[in-house]
């Protein structure tokens, strides 16, 4: 029985119940008078209140008191909502019910010694800054992208030499937040805001002149999340993760994140075309062979990240000035050949057609994806046997 008794259950039991049901189906509960399913729970060591009360909110999550502590719950689902019966940030689901709940802000560089929840966290290891961004399921909404860009710019002002973009232990990034977009009253406009906010983050990384950057993929990455990683000077991945470097499966979405600059630069024009048109998942061995990443190692996220930090320390020591100068020269030469603004303008022109054009394929695909509507048939890029069968049927029959 996963039902939570907030008056009796200790924090560790509440967490076990919530984590046992995370993903599907979630734990059914009453929150501020609304019957919802709860997801993604984290312990809170400092905040206290009456058991069962919502005592704080932060970046879309809510903090609920237990009999001996508190837990953060980041996502809720209202299955009876006719318009939005899917997972969303808790604050979006609860809306005005949270008016009296205090906002507990926390600096990104606050000490990590106390148990709490925050999506974005920054720490330093000598001359290496590490920016963690553990977004639920890797989805990045407009607001999350804006917070991440602000955090990155803050990290870039620090007297360090290397910035590690660590993502989260489960997911690095999966690009735009389709659930938040689907929940919007204006999904086309929200899609536009979201992709521009992601592009702003990529641009901040691409144009960094003071630091070397490392994308450390502890967890899986998909769609725009893969191309965000390519904006870093060096891309390292944990051996067991999976990449999905393509957009077209989402209703022929063209994509942005400066991918038309970043992917051919690493994989070549033909390689970039094969990757984006193939629409297949990719392991790290193949990603290394194709040039998308520069290294693969580590069995666990913690082991992987420890080694990444050591490599980043080496980058900060060995020929740092020469590497930084070479980075600046390369960026200047690339900018002279074709400005980043042109790449972005071209990509967004195609995205505008996806969002606002007559072809509604993206909106239909997003709607079905978020609401878990199964496809009528296996897509042709996966069902290759159909093409083989059609080819065989067209071949002249040999006499028997």
Predicted regions and their residues:
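A structural preference for short, pocket-lining loop segments at secondary-structure junctions
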Residues: 126-131, 145-187, 200-214, 238-242, ...
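Crotonase-fold acyl-CoA enzyme core
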Residues: 207-210, 216-223, 231-242, 246-322
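C-terminal long alpha-helix characteristic of the crotonase
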Residues: 293-362
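Short, active-site-adjacent cap segments at secondary-structure transitions
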Residues: 170-173, 222, 375
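Phosphate/pyrophosphate-binding betaalpha-module
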Residues: 193-196, 200-204, 215, 226-227, ...
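C-terminal extensions of enzymes
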Residues: 337-400
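An anion-binding loop in the catalytic cleft
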Residues: 2-115
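Conserved CoA-thioester-binding segment of acyl-CoA-metabolizing enzymes
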Residues: 85-166
């Amino acid at each position: 029985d996963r039902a939570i008794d907030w008056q009796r259950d200790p924090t560790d039991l509440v967490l076990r119940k919530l984590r046992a049901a995370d993903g599907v189906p979630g734990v059914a509960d009453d929150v501020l008078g609304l019957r919802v399913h709860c997801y993604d729970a984290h312990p809170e060591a400092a905040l206290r209140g009456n058991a069962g009360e919502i005592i704080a909110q932060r970046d879309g999550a809510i903090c609920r008191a237990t009999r001996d502590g508190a837990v953060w719950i980041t996502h809720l689902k209202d299955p009876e909502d006719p318009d939005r019966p899917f997972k969303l940030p808790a604050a979006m689901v609860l809306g005005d019910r949270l008016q009296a709940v205090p906002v507990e802000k926390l600096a990104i560089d606050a000490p990590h010694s106390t148990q709490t929840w925050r999506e974005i966290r920054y720490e330093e290891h000598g001359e290496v800054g590490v920016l963690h961004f553990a977004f639920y399921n890797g989805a990045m909404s407009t607001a999350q992208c804006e917070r991440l860009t602000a955090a990155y710019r803050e990290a870039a002002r620090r007297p360090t030499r290397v910035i590690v973009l660590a993502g989260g232990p489960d997911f690095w990034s999966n690009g735009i937040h389709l659930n938040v977009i689907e929940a919007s009253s204006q999904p086309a406009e929200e899609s536009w805001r979201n992709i521009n906010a992601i592009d702003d983050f990529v641009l901040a990384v691409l144009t960094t002149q003071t630091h070397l950057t490392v994308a450390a993929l502890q967890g899986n990455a998909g769609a725009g999340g893969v191309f965000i990683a390519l904006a870093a000077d060096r891309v390292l991945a944990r051996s067991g993760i999976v990449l999905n470097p393509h957009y077209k499966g989402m209703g022929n979405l063209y994509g942005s994140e400066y991918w038309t600059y970043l992917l051919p630069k690493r994989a070549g024009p033909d390689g970039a075309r094969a990757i984006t048109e193939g629409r297949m998942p990719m392991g790290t061995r193949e990603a290394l062979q194709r040039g998308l990443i520069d290294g693969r190692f580590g069995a666990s996220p913690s082991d992987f990240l420890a080694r990444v930090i050591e490599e980043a320390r080496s980058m900060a020591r060995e020929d740092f000035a020469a590497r930084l100068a070479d980075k600046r020269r390369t960026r200047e030469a690339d900018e002279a050949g074709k400005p980043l603004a042109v790449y972005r303008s071209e990509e967004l022109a195609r995205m505008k057609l996806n969002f606002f054009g007559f072809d509604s394929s993206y909106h239909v695909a997003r709607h079905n994806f978020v609401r878990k509507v199964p496809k009528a048939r296996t897509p042709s890029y996966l069902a290759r046997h159909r093409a083989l069968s059609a080819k065989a049927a067209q071949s002249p029959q040999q006499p028997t």
